[in-house]
């Protein structure tokens, strides 16, 4: 229940308020706040706009707190690791151990959480408005007994004996083992959307195994990395194996557009890593600074935002939603992914190793120029030479960190992250109101305040 009074015990975060004040079409909350206070006619061009927004933030109160995003899809998240385990099992015990190593730690699992929440939010769209393409029989919830079901996401496309390989009588992996059938629909989330969330986490984990080898990382989430625990060769092979298993699961979704989207994300991850290994700076000019920053944003999209954006679009495609919703879902994932990584780059300068669960200041030590140092470069041209030599000179890392702190590098990085955060929140406008949509907004805004 919404109450509007002179003093509210709870106020909206600034980013939430910016969304409320600029919502199009205006939400019930917007109308209640602005109309009640007589500020409905106020516009951003009006000198009183800033004061109006601040006043609105003090007047909004809701009796119904926003639920923790995880709790809304807790059932699906609680079975995530087990379901993935059934997809990636191998006949080789060592490969099993390495491939499942990162799934055993307490990770954030942000990507599958986003896919599941978005899928549930998409289920609030009336079925009459979800007519982009056709549903597979395995995703239809009514009159199941009267259908001639098409193959499910657990059924192979090729003959079992082909997938088995040389010995068709031996069961080595889940490609040929029958899986327990998934419920037709649970919590508003379709079986293919749940499988999508699992695939996304598999792709992400494979990229972590590979990244830790490339970066020679020693710890992740407070534990030894895969390359430290098992060696570089095993870690690389385990990452490859995960991508192979993910590719099989992608194919079994039997949706050409989704297959294209997810296959592209794998290529994007590799492209982004290549971009990170390369340096584009050629001189210390303003043009070089701008080009380097654009390069950084593009690399960030490929390495982080591509998987989020394309998996969000895939969830919308599987829901049957129309093109405007599908496009908005993609933009939401893109902006959220960029916000997530920009905040991550900022934390590398502001948090310690014990808090992050991984070495602090790692980017500079790896020779990487991220947003904080690129912004500081505009004020301190000497950073250009350090970027060019990848901070490999004596004292470069310490000097660069000092200059970032002296300049406005961190504050401008926060502003950039906030921009992406606000855009991601606005991208959710097209979705109908639901608990899951509000949880996505809450999750997005919390990205700005995370400390690890």
UniProtKB/Swiss-Prot annotation:
Q: In which pathway is this protein known to take part?
A: Cofactor biosynthesis; ubiquinone biosynthesis
The cofactor required is: Mg(2+)
EC class of the enzyme, as a word: transferase
CC cofactor note: Binds 2 Mg(2+) ions per subunit.
EC number from the UniProt entry: 2.5.1.-
* A GO BP entry: ubiquinone biosynthetic process
Does the entry feature the keyword Phosphoprotein, yes or no?
A: no
Cellular component terms (Gene Ontology): extrinsic component of mitochondrial inner membrane; mitochondrion; polyprenyl diphosphate synthase complex
**UniProt cross-references to InterPro entries, sorted A to Z:** Isoprenoid_synthase_dom_sf, Polyprenyl_synt, Polyprenyl_synt_CS
What are the GO MF terms of this UniProt record? heptaprenyl diphosphate synthase activity; metal ion binding; prenyltransferase activity
Q: Where does Mg(2+) 1 bind?
A: 211, 215
- What are the entry keywords? Isoprene biosynthesis, Magnesium, Metal-binding, Mitochondrion, Transferase, Transit peptide
According to its UniProt entry, the function of this protein is described as: Assembly of polyisoprenoid side chains. The polyprenyl synthase of coenzyme Q biosynthesis catalyzes the formation from isopentenyl diphosphate of all trans-polyprenyl pyrophosphates generally ranging in length of between 6 and 10 isoprene units depending on the species.
Q: Which PANTHER family match?
A: ALL TRANS-POLYPRENYL-DIPHOSPHATE SYNTHASE PDSS1 (PTHR12001:SF69), GERANYLGERANYL PYROPHOSPHATE SYNTHASE (PTHR12001)
Q: Which family does it belong to?
A: Belongs to the FPP/GGPP synthase family.
UniProt protein name? Probable hexaprenyl pyrophosphate synthase, mitochondrial
> Organism source for this protein?
Yarrowia lipolytica (strain CLIB 122 / E 150)
Q: Its encoding gene is what?
A: COQ1
